[in-house]
C-alpha cells in the first residue's frame, strides 16, 4: 500500500503538473483554446480521429462498409494529434463540444456525429448494414454496444491509466480496476461460449465496438498486461479475437490515424483506398532516410 494517505482539500484546484504524460490533453473546462478550422476532403464522410481503440472502432466500420460495397462510405480520415491540442481547436469543438476523438461530419446531410458508439449506430442505420433489422436481434446488438460504451472506461481510464500510464504506481486503484477488467472479460467469455459473435450468429457493430478494446487487450496490443491479467484463461474471447483479427477491414481499420508501432502499420491519414499501399510511414519515411 502507499506510504501516505491523501486527504482531499475542502476545495479542489487544478494542478496541471500532476497530470503526468496526459497533462496536455486534460483540463477542467470545455471550449476551444485557439482558432483553427478543420480540413475538408473530397469524400462524403469526414473523420477527425486518432488510432486509439475508440478511433479504431469507426475506421473498422468504414472499411467494413466499403468492403461490403457501400461506396457512399468513402471517407477522409484526418489525424487529430491530441498531445498537441488539436481537439481544442475551434473547428473541432464546433463538431464535438466534448473535445474527444473521434468525430465525423457527413457532408451529404450536414450532420455532425460525435461519440464512437453514436458514429457506429449512425453509419449502421445510414447504410443498413451490420445492425440486424429483426427487433430482438437489433436490441441484443445494442445491448452489447452500450455495454462496451459503459464498460471500457474502467479498462482504459481506470486500469490502463493506473497500470500503464500514471506517473506513480498505487496498489489500490490497480487492484480495483484489475478486478473489474477480469470480471468484464469473464462476462465476454461466457457470452462467447454460446455464440459466434457478440450478439449472436451475425457480425455487427457490437463486435466492432468491443474488439478494439478487449480484443486488443488479450492480444497484448494495449497496456502489456496479458500476464498480469492472465488473459489466456479467456479462451472464448481469444477465439473471437483471432477470428475478427483475420478480417481485412479490421486490419486496415487499425492502420488508419495510427501514429505508433511498426511504420508499415501506420497510415496517419487516409484519403484514398490506395493510401494503404503507398502512404504508410515506412513508404513516406524509409529507414535510414534523412
Feature locations, PLM:
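GST-like domain detector, emphasizing the conserved glutathione-binding G-site
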Residues: 1-182, 279-290
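GST-like fold's C-terminal all-alpha helical module
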Residues: 2-3, 136, 143-248, 288-290
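Active-site-flanking alpha-helical
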Residues: 61, 124, 213-214, 254
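Short, solvent-exposed turn/loop segments enriched in Gly/Ser/Thr/Pro and often Arg
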Residues: 81, 205, 257-260
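Short capping/connector residues at structural and topological boundaries
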Residues: 118, 135, 202-203, 255
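Long hydrophobic alpha-helical segments typical of transmembrane helices together
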Residues: 236-290
Amino acid at each position: 500500500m502507499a506510504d501516505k494517505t491523501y486527504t482531499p482539500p475542502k476545495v479542489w484546484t487544478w494542478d496541471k503538473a500532476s497530470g503526468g504524460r496526459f497533462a496536455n490533453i486534460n483540463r477542467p473546462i470545455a471550449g476551444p483554446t485557439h482558432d483553427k478550422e478543420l480540413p475538408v476532403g473530397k469524400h462524403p464522410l469526414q473523420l477527425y480521429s486518432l488510432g486509439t481503440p475508440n478511433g479504431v472502432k469507426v475506421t473498422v466500420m468504414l472499411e467494413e462498409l466499403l468492403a461490403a460495397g457501400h461506396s457512399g462510405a468513402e471517407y477522409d480520415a484526418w489525424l487529430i494529434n491530441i498531445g498537441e491540442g488539436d481537439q481544442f481547436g475551434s473547428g473541432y469543438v464546433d463538431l464535438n463540444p466534448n473535445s474527444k476523438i473521434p468525430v465525423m461530419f457527413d457532408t451529404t446531410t450536414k450532420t455532425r456525429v460525435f461519440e464512437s458508439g453514436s458514429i457506429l449506430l449512425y453509419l449502421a442505420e445510414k447504410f443498413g448494414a451490420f445492425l440486424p433489422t429483426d427487433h430482438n436481434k437489433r436490441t441484443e446488438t445494442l445491448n452489447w454496444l452500450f455495454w462496451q460504451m459503459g464498460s471500457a472506461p474502467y479498462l482504459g481510464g481506470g486500469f490502463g491509466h493506473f497500470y500503464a500510464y500514471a506517473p506513480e504506481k498505487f496498489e489500490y486503484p490497480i487492484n480495483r480496476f484489475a478486478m473489474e477488467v477480469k470480471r468484464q472479460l469473464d462476462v465476454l467469455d461466457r457470452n462467447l461460449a454460446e455464440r459466434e459473435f457478440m450478439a449472436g450468429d451475425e457480425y455487427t457493430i457490437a463486435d466492432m465496438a468491443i474488439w478494439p478494446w478487449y480484443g486488443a487487450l488479450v492480444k497484448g496490443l494495449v497496456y502489456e498486461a496479458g500476464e498480469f491479467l492472465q488473459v489466456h484463461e479467456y479462451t472464448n474471447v481469444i477465439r473471437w479475437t483471432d477470428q475478427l483479427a483475420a478480417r481485412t477491414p479490421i486490419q486496415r481499420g487499425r492502420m488508419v490515424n495510427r501514429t505508433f508501432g511498426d511504420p508499415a502499420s501506420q497510415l496517419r491519414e487516409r484519403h484514398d483506398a490506395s493510401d494503404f499501399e503507398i502512404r504508410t510511414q515506412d513508404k513516406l519515411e524509409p529507414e535510414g532516410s534523412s
